[in-house]
Swiss-Prot record:
It comes from Saccharopolyspora erythraea (strain ATCC 11635 / DSM 40517 / JCM 4748 / NBRC 13426 / NCIMB 8594 / NRRL 2338). It is a peripheral membrane protein. Pathway: Cell wall biogenesis; peptidoglycan biosynthesis. This is UDP-N-acetylglucosamine--N-acetylmuramyl-(pentapeptide) pyrophosphoryl-undecaprenol N-acetylglucosamine transferase. GO terms for biological process: carbohydrate metabolic process; cell division; cell wall organization; lipid glycosylation; peptidoglycan biosynthetic process; regulation of cell shape. It is found in: Cell membrane. Keywords: Cell cycle, Cell division, Cell membrane, Cell shape, Cell wall biogenesis/degradation, Glycosyltransferase, Membrane, Peptidoglycan synthesis, Transferase. It is an enzyme of class 2 (transferase). InterPro entries: GlcNAc_MurG, Glyco_trans_28_C, GlycoTrans_28_N. Its EC number is 2.4.1.227. UDP-N-acetyl-alpha-D-glucosamine binds at T29, A30, G31, N142, R179, S213, Q308. GO terms for cellular component: plasma membrane. It holds the Pfam family Glyco_tran_28_C.
């Protein structure tokens, strides 16, 4: 008699109690990595015994972000897909074969029960390596699905998306998995602490400005050019200009502080300190702003295939945000449109409710439950 039988467990019970092994593939950019890590955290909350392994490349941000969150990182060769026909296309089959082989070795070594892909350079080899051997779950964060996820969706057990119009057939819309510090954020309760943390006026209307991890020149120019008018109107600003940029702002005597910083480590406090946010509309940013119910002015990145404008559309349509094209974001636009908005408390309150109505605070838990279900654990 086996120990399982002696203890009253059947074979199925023993399998169900084995620690699940989840492999997440979402390296390259923060937009791919952060949802993967949010899922990893949610899986651990549901199954503390779970083993979560992240796939990445040697040059991606995951080399810093994944170890910092306490998860093992396995490096595989990236498979960048050229947007246009180039000589690099001739090398693609060899690169794909090498990366798939290395990825399969990782999946075997960790005993993967499920592979969860979020798009990006490491997702394609992960999907191909797992195909027919390890169940696949695909999550698409952008309003327009990328090539890797289009491929993975063809043989995935489950396909999830942030928005209904991702282009992936049969996808279930659940939003984007976010950090618990964002999904549980109570802006009103943290407001005083957040204002003190950043040295902001405790009561003045405050605008949060940021352009992603590297900042945005358009936003930097527009707001630094309007700093004097903002200060004289009694509006404070918390502005993350990017670590590679500098921002010279003359403080208006007696006015609320214009706090220009290279980078924001505590986005939860930044959101809590603000009454209005002006930012790009990457998928993660839109998801976070929606989850915390912060009125927004989105300035989509003017490059790519227009996905940033599409990401923002659900919030704009609901009345929780405005959309300003990059080329139209000027100091004059800030003074004539954004300044009056920052001073209109009633309008901001209405926008906050509308923004919150589009958010998905439970996406991390929902995705974690789906992943564990597919893994059979």
């Amino acid at each position: 008699m086996s120990w399982q039988q002696a203890a009253g467990y059947g074979a199925g019970d023993a399998m169900a109690r084995r620690a699940p092994s989840v492999v997440v593939a979402g390296g390259g950019t923060a937009g791919h990595i952060e949802p993967a890590l949010a899922l990893a955290d949610a899986v651990r909350r549901l199954r503390p015994d779970a083993r979560v392994t992240a796939l990445g490349t040697e040059r991606g941000l995951e080399n810093r972000l994944v170890p910092a969150r306490g998860y093992p990182l396995e490096l595989v060769p990236p498979v960048p897909m050229p947007r246009k026909p180039t000589p690099e296309l001739l090398k693609l089959p060899l690169k794909v074969r090498e990366s798939v082989k290395r990825t399969r070795e990782v999946l075997d070594r960790v005993g993967a029960d499920v592979v969860v892909g979020f798009g990006g350079y490491v997702s394609l080899p992960a999907y191909l390596a797992a195909r027919g051997k390890t169940p696949i779950v695909v999550h698409e964060a952008n309003a327009r699905a990328g090539l890797a996820n289009k491929v993975g969706a063809k043989f995935a057990e489950r396909v999830l998306s942030a928005t209904p119009d991702s282009g992936l057939a049969g996808a279930r819309t659940i939003g984007i998995p976010l950090r618990e510090s964002i999904t549980t954020l109570d802006r009103a309760a943290l407001r005083a602490q957040a204002r003190a943390h950043f040295g902001l006026h405790p009561h003045a209307p405050t605008i949060l400005v940021f352009g992603g991890s590297q900042g945005a020149r358009t936003l930097n120019t527009a707001f630094s050019g309007a700093a004097d008018a903002l200060g004289r109107a009694g509006v404070g600003v918390l502005h993350a200009h990017g670590p590679k940029n500098t921002l010279a702002v003359q403080q208006v005597p007696g006015a609320p502080v214009y706090n220009a910083v290279p980078y924001l480590e505590r986005m939860d406090l930044a959101y809590a300190a603000a009454d209005l946010v002006v930012c790009r509309s990457g998928a993660m940013t839109v998801a976070e702003v929606s989850a915390v119910g912060l009125p927004a002015v989105f300035v989509p990145l003017p490059h790519g295939n227009g996905e940033q404008a599409l990401n923002a559309q659900p919030v704009v349509s609901a009345g929780g945000a405005r959309l300003v094209p990059d080329e139209q974001m000027t100091p004059q636009r800030v003074v004539e449109e954004l300044l009056p908005l920052a001073l209109d408390a009633q309008r901001l309150q209405e926008m906050s409710r509308a923004t919150l109505s589009t958010g998905h605070r439970e996406a991390d838990r929902v995705l974690a439950q789906i992943v564990l279900e597919v893994a059979g654990r």
